[in-house]
Amino acid sequence: MSRLQVAAFYAFTPLNEQQRASLLSDLPDMAMTNSVLGSILVAHEGVNGTISGPEAGVEALLQSLRTSLALGCEHFERLEVKRSWADQAVFRRFKARAKKEIVTMGVTSVNPRQNVGTYVDPKDWNDLVDDPDTLVIDTRNSYETAIGSFEGSLDPSTESFRDFPAWAEASLRPLMNDQSPKRIAMFCTGGIRCEKASSYLQSNGFGEVLHLRGGILNYLGEIPEQESRWQGECFVFDQRVALNHQLEPGVHSLCHACGLPLSPSDRADPSYIKGVQCIHCIDRFSESDRARFLMRQQQFDQTPT
């Protein structure tokens, strides 16, 4: 079996109600025609998705999107795509969903099309983050940062991207006043969260804000491991769970009870029961919950992949 291509992409481009309805109607048919699985979010501000399938099928769906969308030349309004590979399906189905935002911050005034940080290419990232006058911020959630991040970066310890604005005001602003860094450099998985996070910070007086073009995935694809400042694995939102520096599936798996990533040592813990409980959630669920999780896991185990 040929390897499957995985493509993560987004574009901030205005979509009216008719355009959104057409996409939501057409995308499932395009996916089925091209043997593509995955998830695409559609909102008034654009599209955001990850899909997987045969290389030709993935490219055909992406090309259909390029034709359907009014894309521009700026980074945020192009169809920004990060590609990797998998030996087996990384999604169970295809879904196209209508959302209020393609990445949810919950601040209606934030608009990357009007105000966004300065993009930094992967080849220039090391020099930027090595500069002691740069404050490096990981905009991802705590369960993502727990398994890998850039050396020396600040972890906001958020549980949701919605928490970022409150963290910026409560923690980052006092830190900026105390340390007075010359600039902020931020990063996320594929770049989309930094579009909004940098827009928020620049619009609210946090000074010069830069962000990694194409995110961690782009950096790992372009920078040799021996030169890399990345440590650990990169969490991804599909069945691979995490990628190593070669953009191949790493050593982490997912607890299907609580949804958190598990290291080999986590899985070796005596409390771990696949699909039922892990060290992160052993005290979180009831016996009836665990019985339900066990039944679900048994169904997964019996389903052909």
From Swiss-Prot:
Question: Reaction(s) catalyzed by this protein?
Answer: uridine(34) in tRNA + AH2 + O2 = 5-hydroxyuridine(34) in tRNA + A + H2O
Q: Which residues form the Rhodanese domain?
A: 130-228
- GO BP, one annotated term: tRNA modification
Single GO MF descriptor: oxidoreductase activity, acting on paired donors, with incorporation or reduction of molecular oxygen
Spell out the CDD domains in the cross-references. Answer: RHOD_YceA (cd01518)
Q: Does the keyword Transport apply?
A: no
Has UniProt tagged this entry with the keyword Hydrolase?
Answer: no
Top enzyme class, one word, equals: oxidoreductase
Question: Keywords on this record?
Answer: Oxidoreductase, tRNA processing
Catalytic residues at C188 (cysteine persulfide intermediate)
Entry EC no(s): 1.14.-.-
Tell me the InterPro entries matching this sequence.
Rhodanese-like_dom, Rhodanese-like_dom_sf, TrhO, TRHO_N
Instruction: State the similarity comment.
Output: Belongs to the TrhO family.
Its biological function?
Answer: Catalyzes oxygen-dependent 5-hydroxyuridine (ho5U) modification at position 34 in tRNAs.
Quote the protein name from its UniProt record: tRNA uridine(34) hydroxylase
